[in-house]
Amino acid sequence: MSTTWIFDLDNTLHDAESKIFPLVNTRMNEYISSYLDISIEDASELRQSYWDTYGATLKGLIKHHNINPIDFLAATHDLQDFNDLVTPEINLKETISKIKGRKIIYTNAPKNYTHRILKISKVYEMFDEVFTIEDSDFIPKPNQASMAFFLKKYNIK
């Protein structure tokens, strides 16, 4: 039986903290502010509160405000000049190439964003599967239901 390796995306395969997350957070604040008709400051506090409580801002927005997750992700993660924002980890391609077995991305990020990051980082073809927030029906990790679905889908024991 081959070993299965599970990788997160943001801040694992690339540095999202320094350039991408600040931009995504700003876009989330703007979207939440507009959608709920609240100040940017209140939107920022709500975004962080949902992140702390649910592991993903989107989960709180769906639960408490019936937000459309597809619209929200499109508005907050469709970044222009993306190439300049992505900083892959040093020796990423070489390191991943040394890992033998099935490799799967498991991320709370949206599909289009994830695929773009992997392609810009030149490691897209190195992964056998990509499991994104859409695949988990917008239930973020580390939620047990999301993990159970992920493990079953890829027959991981």
Describe each region flagged by the PLM:
Residues D84, I104, P110-K157:
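Substrate-recognition "cap/lid" segment bordering the active-site pocket of phosphatases
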Residues M1-S2, K100, K157:
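A general structural motif
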Residues S2-F7, T12-I90, N112:
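N-terminal helical cap/lid subdomain that shapes the substrate entry/recognition surface
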Residues N91-K100:
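Catalytic-core regions built around general acid/base machinery
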Residues A16, I105-Y106:
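Small/polar loops that bind or transfer phosphate-bearing groups
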Residues H65, I99, V123-M126:
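Short, structured coil segments at secondary-structure junctions
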